[in-house]
Amino acid sequence: MELGTVKAVITGGASGLGRATAARLIAAGARVALLDRPASAGEDVAKSFGPSAAFTPADVTSAEAVTAALDAAVAHCGGLNVLVNCAGIGTAMKTLGKSGPAKLEEFTRVIQVNLIGTFNCIRLAAPHMAKSAPGAHGERGVIINTASVAAFDGQIGQAAYSASKGGIVGLTLPVARDLAELGIRVCTIAPGLFDTPLLAGLPEPARVSLGKQVPFPPRLGRPAEYGALAAQIVENAMLNGETIRLDGAIRMQPR
């Protein structure tokens, strides 16, 4: 798919990986809707991108809110042929800690936002994509999900986060097969240590130390590098049903 023909919805688009992906696509001529929490900076971010971008507020776990946001996105973009799922949350909790067993509601919340929220957006975006005019080889859409290296190398305290991201990896191939007959591709990116809002609260020395754990390049990943890979997935029609690690060859240790 040519980037100039992209009509995209990006969840979590107000910051981090989502915002960087929006910037990459808009620079190539795409029209983009940023789907993020109503309390996010989405409105200001969309305005900063100019008329090619719009903010469509929604909670990714709500069918009603996502349906309304997608309808607004389709109206703004003139259709929908790309979905990039970047919305997500993280929490640290040991299965059994000093205060007792992990709180089930915390585990459930992470699964609800990261895994169920991703699938909710996929299932509701697919009907819009199916209405798109087919391009080369009948392609109608591309869906890109965001997992994490925690899906493979979960650390102590990451049971909920790793489970949610592992679920995204697990659904990638079957959803790609489900949607293949409609001409819709599905891939997942599993980032390593990236300079995103999830790490923003750390002191600079701690961020530098984390970056040095990466074999090469020995630094935190840049959101623009995620955006570049997302753009390459959109352009390369043979990328389908695959999870790509974007991690500088890091393999996380237990802690």
Predicted ranges, named:
Residues 148:
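Residue(s) in the substrate-gating loop at a strand-loop-helix junction
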Residues 89, 100-120, 144, 168:
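Catalytic Tyr-X3-Lys loop
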Residues 180, 185, 239-242:
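Short, small/polar-rich loop/turn modules that mediate ligand/substrate recognition or access, typified
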Residues 127, 176-178:
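Alpha-helical segment proximal to the catalytic Tyr-Lys
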Residues 3-33:
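Canonical Rossmann dinucleotide-binding motif of NAD(H)/NADP(H)-dependent dehydrogenases/reductases
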Residues 90-108, 127, 131-137, 157-160, ...:
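Conserved mid-core segment of classical short-chain dehydrogenase/reductases
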Residues 222-246, 251:
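C-terminal substrate-recognition "lid" of short-chain dehydrogenase/reductases
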Residues 122, 164, 172:
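Active-site helix of classical SDR
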